[in-house]
Amino acid sequence: GMLRFNTDIGRLEVWRNDHWATILGESPNLGDHNQTNSAGGTGTRGLFAGGYLASPSPLSGNAFNNVDAITVETLGNSMDFNNLTGSFMGGGQCADRTRALYAGGRGPTASSGDNANISFCTIASRGDYADSGFDLSTSVSCRGTSNSTRGLFGSFISPYADTIDYVTIQSLGNAQDFGNLTEVRGYGMAVSSPVRAVWAGGINNPTNLGTNVIDYVTLSTTGNAQDFGDLVSNSGTGAYESGNVNSSTRGVIAGGTRFSKIIDFFTIATTGNSQRFGDLDVLTKSGKGSVCSTTRGVIAGGIGDPTPATVNNMEYITIPTTGDAIDFGDLQSFARRLPQAGCSNGHGGL
């Protein structure tokens, strides 16, 4: 049948007698057979970027520039992959099938000033991130999400803001104003399908308490977010700096808040409150990083119990099902850390 390019979702479609059917793109399967860790497998490459070390490390309070890599389909420890342009914590990441972006953050210490820069790397190679020469609209920490063409950054802190910025991943440029979240909040989580981006939870301003709000935007347009529903399982304290993974249809929010193992999920294309998915294996607080394929989500790091120790464990879930998380492996051994920024070349938004 006839072909067309659907600019709303950034995909090619074919006419099937009575409807347009999407032609699915494929992410390149990456891996390094010389490795004996997770990255030795072939499949979706996930990147955990930056973070900072907490007690009892003698370097506690310092951010770092290391980026870890895993193959999402292969259990095992991460490998040292490449480096950010500086030592940052709290930045946001997003990616299409070939390029990863890192934006914002704070460094080189946890008390340093904020960074507005947008940097990028080629996911298939181990070359370091490069400075794009372009910036976010403000220099703050944030969370990122994307479809195959457009990256969004929001849930800013320092100060808390309702701003949403966007960039075109392959052409870059300074971030443009997309719209606003339904409330001012920072430390929220973001997931996406090819059509929608959804923000969930965070810390509200001016109360400085966790919020359970979920709101969404349509990625191909610009405009303010609309109410989606609420995070139900963490309704008492909200959720912030949690793990966030997604398939093309389902978003999953894992842990975070004030020491919680709770995992919630929601269907991205609809609206409504979240439902209980299961529990994480390790009890942690906030500061989690996460990466995913269309079927598996990997959640890593965080603040351990007792605080302020950080943990280097990774655990995984199967996104289309429900159930408890299972041990995946560890972030590289020297890095007991809070990654916060994760992305992959095969997530459900592509």
Language-model features: locations:
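Polar, enzyme-active/binding microenvironments
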Residues: 2-350
